[in-house]
Amino acid sequence: VSGRLEGRVAVVTGGGDGIGAGVARLFAAEGARVLVAEIDEAKGRAVAEEIGGLFVHVDVTDRDQVEGMIATAVDTWGSVDILVNNAWGGANLGRVEHKTDEMLHRGFAMGYYGPFWAMRAAFPHMSRAGWGRVINMVSLNGVNAHIGSLEYNSAKEALRTLTRTAAREWAPTGVVVNAIAPGAKTAALQRRIAQNPDIAAAVDAANPMGRLGDPLTDIAPVALFLASEDCRYVTGNTIFADGGGHINGVAWAPELPDAPAG
């Protein structure tokens, strides 16, 4: 282990499972002090204890909790150098015409407003230090308009726009902002596979490498690069860490219910 993040303070939302847990583990192994922000207290505490980090219970749809998360990192360690916006709570599978206002509001609260609030709260600390790294987890689903998950697709594409806009505005301050579109065994996908095991085979078959990525060994190293000193001249990008899946697009489609999503 090279200690590429030695002395840095990292905040990882959704850090109790899947990609977030993989990122938290690798960042800690590389020397960072990691705040694990998670709505599932048992999972979040377990990861934080494992890596010697700090757990904070956070619902990213609550602005006060998100701002408090950043304040806790600063109060505890004096700074926040790295922010990974990863948390997501799932979407209601259904056709566009069956989506409700509440579904869209919740999707944007999780996938757009939560990251925005965290970025807004973290930026003053990063800019004063003249150094900062923001990593937003986005999705190929938004790029290729995967059917059935409008609120997820839309929020993730809005987050890509936020990524590029912040990257342009914040570049003079030493704060770089990038996104990762992972093709990985996320917690949400695992839940969907549990309900419909055929999805796993379909997703693997559609990938040029024949498999989904592992959060720790395939996705977290990309986040490590974006969080490191090596990323000083890289900003406003989306990296597709998906085994080439973006070349094929989303080649599988779920069966959508005829009735409105519940």
Predicted regions and their residues:
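Conserved mid-core segment of classical short-chain dehydrogenase/reductases
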Residues: 67, 90-105, 128, 148-151, ...
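Short C-terminal tail/terminal secondary-structure segment
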Residues: 2, 93, 235-262
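Alpha-helical segment proximal to the catalytic Tyr-Lys
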Residues: 124, 168-172, 232
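C-terminal substrate-recognition "lid" of short-chain dehydrogenase/reductases
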Residues: 116-119, 131, 212-241, 246
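Conserved glycine-rich cofactor-binding loop
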Residues: 9, 16-18
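Residue(s) in the substrate-gating loop at a strand-loop-helix junction
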Residues: 139
